[in-house]
Amino acid sequence: MSRICELTGKGRQVGNNVSHANNRTKRTFLPNLQNVTLISDALGKGVTLRVSTHGLRSVEHVGGLDNWLLKTKNEKLSTRALKVKREVAKKLAAA
């Protein structure tokens, strides 16, 4: 399982540990990923995704999973999130 947020595409970054003597050693910065069940209002069920805490706050800020998926570009979303996005769009078009 890769360490990438399924909603924002946020992944690992590479940088340096810098000691007091200014010695630099390579290190990775991993995103804070959580397995979360987000409720879709349009589908009426929960969707389990692996989301960064930043992504979780962004979803809540926009007003829920459905709004987030419809406003986000497809390139940023994982295949699982794209599948949910298509289901939500189909459900909203039928309503």
UniProtKB/Swiss-Prot annotation:
Q: Which family does it belong to?
A: Belongs to the bacterial ribosomal protein bL28 family.
| InterPro entries referenced in this protein's UniProt entry, alphabetically | Ribosomal_bL28, Ribosomal_bL28/bL31-like_sf, Ribosomal_bL28_bact-type, Ribosomal_bL28_sf
Q: What NCBIfam families does the database record attribute to this sequence?
A: L28 (TIGR00009)
| A cellular-component GO term for this protein | cytosolic large ribosomal subunit
| One GO BP annotation of this record | translation
Q: Which UniProt keywords apply?
A: Ribonucleoprotein, Ribosomal protein
PANTHER family in UniProt: 39S RIBOSOMAL PROTEIN L28, MITOCHONDRIAL, LARGE RIBOSOMAL SUBUNIT PROTEIN BL28M
Transmembrane helix recorded as keyword: no
Domain of life of the native organism: Bacteria
Recorded GO MF terms: structural constituent of ribosome
One Pfam family this sequence matches: Ribosomal_L28
**Protein's name according to its UniProt entry:** Large ribosomal subunit protein bL28
